[in-house]
Amino acid sequence: MSVFTHLSLSPINIAAVLCLTKAYNTAYAKGEQMINETMFARGAESSIIREIFSYGLERKAQIGAENVFDFSLGNPSVPAPAAVAESIKKALELPSDQLHGYTPAPGLPQCRVAVAESLNRRFGTSYEGKDVFMTVGAAASLTCTLNAVTNPGDEVIVIAPYFPEYRVWIEKAGCTCVEAPADEGTFQLSVGNVLKAITDKTAAVIIDSPNNPTGAVYTRDTLMRLANVLREVNAKRDPENPIMLISDEPYREIVYGAEVPWVPSIYENTVVCYSYSKSLSLPGERVGWILVPNTNPQAARLMPAVAGAARTLGFVCAPALFQRVIIDCIDEPSDVEAYARNRTALTDALAEYGYTYVEPDGAFYLWVKALEPDANAFCERAKKYELLAVPSDSFGMPGWFRLGYCVSYETIINSLPAWKQLADEYR
């Protein structure tokens, strides 16, 4: 019996299979690659952040972890709250189909309600569970949102410097990433530069406050001026096609006294993307959410679009176990004091050694001016002292580097002599 008989293929289908096989073999013989070249390029050119992190792991294996000062990755060293472990223990008593089974695509109803009620307590809002879509972390939140609010050929504005993966996700949605430089004195969002970047093709603006990589927290005044500019632009557009503001907020709870305004209360056409990677120190568990506020005029159409994007991109549901953890731990505080201590130790020393940096009001990153114009060359030289920093070019701004001070306090202190030696080379 032939394989075609076994598969019960008709003669027409057999001919089609043979034709496709012949075409593939011809292409293979010519050396043509039957793969997606864009995806190949993305995989071959890995994230510079991950590249440096991998290099750090190699060096730690070679010379000992205590001798490598890796500031590359935003990987919290602060432990998850004790309540997380207790919640996991409790969940392990559940029947297997509840613990490990699928949840509804938008998330467990009780988890969505817990998120909405937490936001209502904090911001005086009136959200419901149906306004929340649970996701596999902030990356999934952003990719789903971008695919929901844009069409191929649209433009999405980012504030430079910006998290490098924004460009990847924007371009995957078939859109063009347009950079609007921040104010280089304060690294506040520059409303004027955003206005200059807006065209008829602009579909969305992404903001990230507290900001990665600068640590800047956008003020209420800045956000109100941005909202007014967007409304002025929207007034000249089809009412069904306003510019959407995507507020990426994984660092919301990690602030040092600054106010982090609730963006949907300032601009109505806002979608919020969130992750528990930083606030609960759960970066590897991949759980977060999208909020489509019920005050957003496009909400009735936008939430189904988010669901459709998640389905199309292959996100079946957020992890069942950690949705249950979120229900129990949603209002657990972040250990901001640990990050504040790291920040003080690092900034005090770098200032003494002659480095220039942006005073961070939030997140756990320090944005430092390189001691030579080429930040890549500077970061390569830093490796001589086992100092691993991320050059700024991939963030859309040359001449700086990013340090993630979410490492242990011991790493900060032990790295300081190396930072001084490096600075001395440039004197």
Enumerate the language-model features and the residues they cover:
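N-terminal small-domain helix-loop-helix segment of the aminotransferase-like
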Residues: 35-137, 144, 322, 329-336, ...
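PLP-dependent enzyme catalytic core of the Aspartate aminotransferase-like
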Residues: 24-27, 121, 195, 331, ...
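Conserved core segment of the aminotransferase class I/II
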Residues: 268-340
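Conserved glycine-rich beta-strand-loop-beta hairpin in the small C-terminal domain of fold type I
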Residues: 320-327, 339-351, 357-369
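Alpha-helix termini
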Residues: 58-64, 122-124, 229-242, 294-300, ...
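Short, Lys/Arg-enriched N-terminal segments with co-localized hydrophobic residues
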Residues: 12-33
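Conserved core of the PLP fold type I
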Residues: 96-240, 252-266, 271
